[in-house]
């Protein structure tokens, strides 16, 4: 062991020794922190892979259940009526089994593709315990895209325009129509 002869030498030797220990301690901390970061990244990647696999399995289950429900509802709709055409894909609401058309705010809009006089369309809807749609009920909703140019309850065609239009000759003109049934 070396013994310094003056205070200056003693300080420099002691400082060098302390400085060396500090460097070794800092290097150990850096290594430990680096290892901890690597371990946390590996754990994060494993958890993301696991969660992705779980979500893929759940998505496949939901899609197959949804596909089966749509197939069942389409088969029921085809069996119930041969002259009706469903105007949209089967609606997934609580009334899906009893509405073979567009469901909106408690009403079922059933599309009839056969051209009828206004009186015949109104009578056909009455036999089904339903009515022709009111223009005011559908004008500001997404339904207007479907019911446009069909018979309205006032005997005129339902149109997007709000300008005055010529009254239709309901004794001769034929149109497609919707019957609106209130769902319970």
UniProtKB/Swiss-Prot annotation:
Forms a complex with OPG162 and OPG190 to coordinate the incorporation of OPG164 into wrapped enveloped virion (EV) membranes and, subsequently, the production of actin tails. Therefore plays an essential role in efficient cell-to-cell spread of viral particles. It comes from the Viruses. Homodimer, disulfide-linked. Interacts with protein OPG190. Interacts (via C-terminus) with protein OPG164. Interacts with OPG162. GO terms for cellular component: host cell membrane; membrane; viral envelope; virion membrane. The keyword Cytoplasm does not apply. The chain crosses the membrane at residues 34-56. Its main location: virion. Keywords: Disulfide bond, Glycoprotein, Host membrane, Membrane, Signal-anchor, Transmembrane, Transmembrane helix, Viral envelope protein, Virion. Pfam families: Chordopox_A33R. It is found in: Virion membrane; Host membrane. Belongs to the orthopoxvirus OPG161 family. Glycans are attached at residue 134. Residues 98-184 are annotated as: C-type lectin-like domain. It is a single-pass type II membrane protein. Residues 57-184 are virion surface. Residues 1-33 are intravirion. SUPFAM superfamilies: C-type lectin-like. This is Protein OPG161. The keyword Membrane applies.
């Amino acid at each position: 062991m070396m013994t310094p002869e003056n205070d200056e030498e003693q300080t420099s030797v002691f400082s060098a020794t302390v400085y060396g220990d500090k460097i070794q301690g800092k290097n150990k901390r850096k290594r430990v922190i680096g290892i901890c970061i690597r371990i946390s990244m590996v754990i994060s990647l494993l958890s993301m892979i696991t969660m992705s696999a779980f979500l893929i399995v759940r998505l496949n289950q939901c899609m197959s259940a949804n596909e089966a429900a749509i197939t069942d509802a389409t088969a029921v709709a085809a069996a119930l009526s041969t002259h009706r055409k469903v105007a949209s894909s089967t609606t997934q609401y609580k009334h899906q089994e009893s509405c073979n058309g567009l469901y909106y705010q408690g009403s079922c809009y059933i599309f009839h593709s056969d051209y009828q006089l206004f009186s015949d369309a109104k009578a056909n809807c009455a036999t089904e315990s339903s009515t022709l749609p009111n223009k005011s009920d559908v004008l500001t909703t997404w339904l207007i895209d479907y019911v446009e140019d069909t018979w309205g309850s006032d005997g005129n065609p339902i149109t997007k325009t709000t300008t005055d239009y010529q009254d239709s000759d309901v004794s001769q003109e034929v149109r497609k129509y919707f019957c609106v049934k209130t769902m319970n």
